From Swiss-Prot:
The gene is rpoC. Its EC number is 2.7.7.6. Its cofactor is Mg(2+); Zn(2+). This is DNA-directed RNA polymerase subunit beta'. SUPFAM superfamilies: beta and beta-prime subunits of DNA dependent RNA-polymerase. DNA-dependent RNA polymerase catalyzes the transcription of DNA into RNA using the four ribonucleoside triphosphates as substrates.
Length: 1398
């Protein structure tokens, strides 16, 4: 009996482990795993269905087919456990050992493992230092390889063809040894002395100068060092014994009709065994060499196919001509082991059904059909039936439930009470896609869902289905209740704003009841309180929209959160007075004393959350919903065709536009404008006309004339149903109404370009055939786009999750002093994002100081909550240094202070929160709303490009930035000669209000320090040409300005004036390739001018295309224009927008023609040009020259003698993020990526908090490249995890040795995911074969730190309560005896309900 109990104990005990290691198995190891050799290719006997002995399913090797029963039937039952039957040789045990016992095949000739041969870069090739082609020739018997040269002049590893070999054999006899096939390669590997190779490589690396050689050597060194560290012998890459998978994992199932369904692996193994046995026989028979060779080659190919079919040559096919699924195919790809079975399991205790709306539910409830609940909660009901003694056995209980006896329903109610269930709607794009609810039993078969959570699930009721899951254990129930209950998830984790916001009908109802109407019934009445007002409304004495006076009780909270009641008389509308009844205590009436549109309601809920806490807000949201539905019903909104009012002015607007277009057409025919200009102008005209019609239409829809009580005619906001729906934000938008009642406007072709004939009709008038046809273009493109977009967006999310999945908050504070300086985001003089929005919920990194009194207002380490931010704003502080995930110094994970507030909860983030995954979801979830296309600059965009002046938008004082340089010309105008100068405008307290870039050659209209009013012009310039301006006065002397060589004379047809234009050097004769036309300046004595204080000559070079405006010998003053460059040369670049742009940024791709940034701070000069390239030299402060070769077409923004800062752009073009990191550092890179990503999302109106993007940038920066290894034994140029280097450096410093010096390096998200420390995570992401091959050779150890690895091995994830569990487990493993009270340290913070919201 004891034995039996032990058996059960052993089944439930789970393995505890801290890491998983992967390596190469030696032949002896493989034999030790095996329970016997598979000698025959037979599987099972087709008549008896019993496995054949020594075959692929042999019971003697793999174990019995039935539990505790040997094959011949001599021993049956449990009492013979462990006996080995002497007749059939089968051990009597459980049949499930057939899932774990392996066999093996002794190969007659060694075989190379294809992964180490063909998975690039070829590991075999790297170890042997031979090319893949050569090794393949040896392996597949096309050539010999010299293994031992002996005393001959041959080299080890040299290849010989058959003839060579025979010739050498005659020449040297058996002095040398050469082999072919895997034996040859095995001997080479066996004779490799790893230790001495490593030493020689180390010395070679220190000697070598060339980069390519260094790369090659360090790669090889890395592999050999991996062998050394992990104790793996290189010859194990060649298989001598092949393991055989347990038979239950490659099943053979008899179908009816005598056929068998089998796993492809059986076919592949059969081929290997057949060829192996044939080879053995040939060797015994001493067959001719050529036949044996052929058989060996076939064996090699058979093993290749088994391991990775199709990797080399044609894939082996089965009877039905499809390629067989090999071992490698089993684990890789979407339907492989990792993604299909380990990361995506099916779950029991779950069901799915269609959803319908549940407007009577409370926020934390969902309606669950009784039938479904009965099935889901079966075990709980069985338990109750037994406990209450209503059923004696489970079997009896089962019968009662199946017969649906009345008592069962009562018990179901009892079981379900307080037992939350989880609802999930696919696709689950963010964590709010699964939420917990308390079930309410309902009749019918559909699940009822609360309307307010639809936004989070992105659910609607047009046939959507949802899945229900039951959390079983008490811990699971507790977590579902405290963390996942819908009423605990009011805020969106992406931006911290409420996600439980009324929409559609509810908004319409609330909007309708808070609107006011002139001269409504009951206008001017007075009410003692709201109840009296309600009576008047119920008795139809007063309308909802009437202006009335009501006494309203207002409850506010003072500083100590005590309730203060005040009663005041307000003049308001009856509807708003009714609405005031449901306000939570703490919100003043002023919040609802206006027409409530969707935005206002969102603000209302936000304010309620911040002031009154979570509980009150949830109750309030529910009440809002009930009220909204009630009054939407009362309103009885309806729309008719007549509601779509077509504006009277439409005809004349269209007429004017047509006239303008005719005018442009005639200009075009007479050759005044080009085809491109004509197209742009026409599109522009129609765009403006469409806007004008829309404006007229909204004006007409939005107002109506009525008579007031005095009999005067007044205009009030319209009660037109269509207008109200759009205005309230319930449904529809101005753009859609414009198509119904205005004009449809311009349409796009499928390639994204705009068709220049607009659709002037609208849907109310109806479209003619041509118009309808043009419309269909856009609609179809939209559908095609959506399909593509979903896939792309999903893939982006997957990559983001993969790169951040191991980032968890692991400690409270890392103690770093670093942070990010944040100021308001200003673009083109307009504040795009205010400072408060950017710092809210962060932790201050340094003290915040009052700019006027210089005293500390908030100390470093303060969480910047709403109140703090309000104070900061009031004090006029315009930049704050905050903690950021980028500079967090926690080794593995993040600290709570660097992350700041948990946006979905409203207080400082808990230890154990998986912030990486949340960041990935927040960025990926709106992905489907982004556009897919690249925009062509055309129409409206080109109009914006031709700006010619800067205007101030606010009052204040002008400040020039340090980069601004200017000269005063003869007309006493200030002319800017810097390219990166900016004008700031600061208010009285010195805060920056706006900033503007000033282009080169602009005339500055204001001086530094001047006080200006809003609307003042700051600078003007000619938008069509770019000047070349002299900074010095003197007499012009041309050099290399030769007509027909470097310049061409152009005569204007109309005016007859001639100008000199610098021509492209491509058209010059070869002798003048290196000359560039330039100007030297002479002083009065005729000497060449030098730049003040230096020996450098003033020399101004003309660019290609410049029109020279001065004559040789002319005197010029400072600030005069020497030449103009027409602006038409600037090509319009396509802007990559939407999803592709976000992916491009996160993948850290270098743009095509990237701009060049200065590597050092120094002075610019131009060197001698080469063919097609110009040479730019920057001489740094120590006098070292740095050269750049730049193609002639590129526009160099720096000019001769200019002093540039390190990281400043000197050649125009898009920036390469890698350059920003290298030259300007991590902060600049982070702000670049953040701003660029935010631009894309902002365009679509999506709000995402910056910190999510920073979290991802942190993960992109997690590797460093070793610059100087010190005493660490790392290799220069090697990429290592930052945490690993820090660890090694700590050890070095402790030992008093030299630590390594390293530089940060930026990896794209795919690269970063694949290069993570965890090989399990990387293998389950992409390129499984490559990752596993590399890991096996290096003998890698996976510490199971991330979430994904732990899910794959089936443990709790190290986040949330799982973090506490793992910490405890590790401490116990370390032998610490822990008190129960300390068990939960470092785990969850108490539930949201017991926490006051900050």
């Amino acid at each position: 009996m004891k034995a039996l109990l032990d058996l059960f104990k052993q089944a439930t005990h789970e393995e505890e482990f801290d890491a998983i290691k992967i390596g190469l198995a030696s032949p002896d190891k493989i034999r030790s795993w095996s329970y016997g050799e598979v000698k025959k290719p037979e599987t099972i006997n087709y008549r008896t269905f019993k496995p054949e002995r020594d075959g692929l399913f042999c019971a003697k090797i793999f174990g019995p087919v039935k539990d505790y029963e040997c094959l011949c039937g001599k021993y049956k039952r449990l009492k013979h456990r462990g006996v080995i039957c002497e007749k059939c040789g089968v051990e009597v045990t459980l049949s499930k050992v057939r899932r774990e016992r392996m066999g093996h095949i002794e190969l007659a000739s060694p075989v190379a493992h294809i992964w180490f041969l063909k998975s690039l870069p070829s590991r075999l090739g790297m170890v042997l230092d031979m090319t893949l082609r050569d090794i393949e020739r040896v392996l597949y018997f096309e050539g010999f390889v010299v293994v031992e040269p002996g005393m001959t002049p041959l080299n080890r590893g040299q290849l010989l063809t058959e003839e060579d070999y025979l010739g050498k054999l005659e020449e040297y006899g058996d002095e040398f040894k050469a082999l072919m096939g895997a034996e040859g390669v095995r001997e080479l590997l066996r004779s490799l002395d790893v230790a001495s190779e490593v030493e020689t490589l180390h010395s070679e690396i220190s000697k070598t100068g060339s980069d390519t050689k260094l790369k090659k050597l360090s790669k090889r060194l890395k592999i050999l060092e991996g062998f050394q560290k992990s104790g793996i012998k290189p010859e194990w890459m060649i298989l001598e014994v092949l393991p055989v998978l347990p038979p239950e994992l490659r099943p053979l199932v008899p179908l009816d009709g005598g056929r068998f369904a089998t796993s492809d692996l059986n076919d592949l193994y059969r081929r290997v065994i057949n060829r192996n046995n044939r080879l053995k026989r040939l060797l015994e028979l001493k067959a001719p060499e050529i036949i044996v060779r052929n058989e060996k080659r076939m064996l090699q190919e058979a093993v290749d196919s088994l391991l990775d079919n199709g990797r080399r040559g044609k894939a082996m096919t089965g009877a039905n001509k499809r390629p067989l699924k090999s071992l490698a195919d089993m684990i890789k790809g979407k339907s492989g082991r990792f993604r299909q079975n380990l990361l995506g399991k099916r779950v029991d205790y779950s069901g799915r059904s269609v959803i319908v709306v549940g407007p009577t539910l409370k926020l934390h409830q969902c309606g669950l059909p009784k039938k479904m609940a009965l099935e889901l909660f079966k075990p709980f009901i069985f338990n109750r039936l037994e406990v209450l003694g209503l059923a004696t056995t489970i079997k009896a209980a089962k019968k009662m439930v199946e017969d649906e006896e009345p008592i069962v329903w009562d018990l179901l109610e009892e079981v379900i009470r307080e037992h939350p269930v989880m609802l999930n709607r696919a696709p689950t794009l963010h964590r709010l896609g699964i939420q917990a609810f308390e079930p309410v039993l309902i009749e019918g078969k559909a699940i009822q869902l609360h309307p307010l959570v639809c936004a989070a699930f992105n659910a609607d009721f047009d046939g959507d289905q949802m899945a229900v899951h039951v959390p079983l254990s008490l811990e699971a129930q507790a977590e579902a209740r405290t963390l996942m209950l819908a009423s605990n998830n009011v805020l969106s984790p992406a931006n911290g704003e409420p996600i439980i916001v009324p929409s559609q009908d509810i908004v319409l109802g609330l909007y309708y009841m808070t609107r006011e109407k002139v001269n409504a019934k009951g206008e001017g009445m007075m009410f003692a309180d709201v109840t009296e007002a309600r009576r008047a409304y119920d008795n139809r004495e007063a309308e909802l929209h009437a202006r009335v006076t009501v006494r309203i009780k207002e409850v506010t909270l003072d500083e100590n959160k005590n309730r203060v009641e005040t009663v005041k008389r307000v003049e308001t509308t009856l509807g708003r007075a009714l609405l005031s009844e449901i306000l939570p205590p703490g919100l003043p009436f002023s919040f609802v004393d206006k027409a409530l549109k969707k935005k206002e309601i969102s603000k209302l809920i936000n304010a309620s959350f911040r002031r009154c806490g979570l509980r009150e807000t949830v109750i309030f949201a529910d009440k809002l919903m009930y009220t909204g539905f009630t009054f939407a019903t009362r309103a009885g909104m309806s729309i008719a065709i007549k509601d779509m009012l077509i504006p009277q002015e439409k005809g004349q607007i269209l007429g004017a536009a047509e006239a303008e277009v005719k005018e442009i057409e005639s200009q075009y025919t007479s050759g005044l404008v080009t085809q491109g200009e004509r197209y742009n102008k026409v599109v522009d005209i129609w765009g403006r006309a469409g806007d004008a019609v829309a404006k007229a239409m909204m004006g007409q829809l939005g107002g109506e004339k009525v008579t007031d009580r005095q009999g005067k005619e007044v205009t009030q906001e319209s009660f037109n149903a269509i207008y109200m729906m759009a205005d309230s934000g319930a449904r529809g938008s101005a753009a859609q109404i414009r198509q119904l009642a205005g004009m449809r406007g311009l349409m796009a072709k499928p390639d994204g370009s705009i068709i220049e004939t607009p659709i002037t009709a609208n849907f109310r008038e109806g479209l003619n055939m041509l118009q309808y046809f043009i419309s269909t273009h856009g609609a179809r493109k939209g559908l095609a786009d959506t399909a593509l977009k979903t896939a792309n967006s999903g893939y982006l999310t997957r990559r983001l999750v993969d790169v951040t999945q191991d980032l968890v908050v692991t400690e409270d504070d890392c103690g770093t002093k670093n942070g990010l300086l944040v100021k308001a985001l200003v673009e083109g003089g307009e504040v795009v994002e205010a400072l408060r929005e950017r710092i809210l919920g962060r932790v201050a990194a340094s003290d915040i100081i009052n700019p006027e009194t210089q005293e500390t207002v908030f100390e470093a380490g303060t969480l910047l909550s709403e109140d703090v931010v309000d104070t900061i704003e009031a004090l006029g502080i315009d930049e704050v240094r905050v903690r950021t995930p980028l500079t967090c110094e926690t080794r593995y994970g993040l600290c709570a202070n660097c992350y700041g507030r948990d946006l979905g909860r409203g207080y400082l983030v808990n230890v154990g929160e998986a912030v990486g995954v949340i960041a990935a979801q927040s960025i990926g979830e709106p992905g489907t709303q982004l556009t897919m296309r690249t925009f062509h600059i055309g129409g409206a965009a080109s109009r914006a490009a031709a700006a010619s002046q800067l205007e101030a938008k606010s009052n204040g004082a002008v400040q020039y930035t340090a980069t601004m340089r200017y000269v005063t010309n003869a007309r006493k105008e200030l002319v800017a000669i810097s390219r990166s100068g900016e004008i700031l405008i600061a208010d009285d307290s010195g805060r920056e209000r706006e900033r503007h870039k000033v282009p080169y050659g602009a005339t500055l209209m204001v001086t530094d320090g001047a006080k200006i009013k809003a609307g003042a012009v700051l600078a003007t310039w000619d938008p069509h040409t770019r000047p070349i301006i002299t900074e010095y006065a003197g007499r012009v002397r041309f050099e290399n300005v030769e007509e027909g060589v470097t310049v061409a004379k152009q005569v204007d047809d109309v005016t007859g004036l001639s100008t000199l234009v610098v021509i492209d050097p491509k058209r010059k004769s070869t002798s003048t390739k290196g000359v560039r036309p330039q100007v030297k300046l002479l002083d009065d004595a005729g000497n060449e001018l030098k730049i003040a204080g230096t020996d450098t000559l003033v020399n101004i070079t003309f660019q290609i295309g410049s029109i020279i405006t001065v004559k040789d010998g002319q005197d010029v003053a400072v600030g005069d224009v020497l030449a103009r460059i027409p602006q038409e040369t600037s090509k319009t670049r396509d802007i990559t927008g939407g999803l592709p742009r976000v992916a491009e940024l996160f993948e850290a791709r270098s743009p095509k023609d990237a701009g060049v940034l200065a590597e050092v701070t120094g002075t610019v000069s131009f060197g001698k040009d080469t063919k097609g390239k110009q040479r730019l030299v920057i001489t740094d402060l120590d006098g070292v020259a740095h050269e750049y070769l730049i193609t002639k077409e590129k526009h160099v923004t720096a000019h001769d003698g200019q002093i540039v800062q390190k990281g400043e752009m000197i050649v125009d073009g898009p920036v390469d993020p890698h350059d920003i990191l290298r030259l300007q550092g991590v902060e600049a890179l982070a702000s670049y990526i953040t701003d660029e990503v935010q631009d894309v999302y902002r365009l679509q109106g999506v709000k995402i908090n910056d910190k999510h993007i920073e979290v991802i940038v942190r993960q992109m920066l997690r590797r460093v490249v070793v610059a100087d290894p010190g005493d660490t034994g790392l290799i220069p140029g090697e990429q290592v995890e930052r945490s690993e280097v820090l660890q090694i450096n700590d050890e070095m410093i402790a030992a008093g040795k030299e630590p390594a010096v390293y530089d940060p390096i930026l990896l794209g998200i795919t690269k970063a995911s694949l290069s993570t420390d965890s090989f399990i995570s990387a293998a389950s992401f992409q390129e499984t074969t490559r990752v596993l091959t590399e890991a096996a050779i290096m003998g890698k150890k996976d510490e199971l730190r991330g979430l994904k690895e732990n899910v794959i091995v089936g443990r709790l994830i190290p986040a949330g309560s799982g973090l506490a569990y793992h910490n405890t487990r590790r401490r116990q493993a370390a032998g610490e005896d822990m008190g129960a009270d300390r068990l939960l340290e470092g785990g969850e913070t108490p539930a949201a309900e017991n926490q006051e919201v900050a």
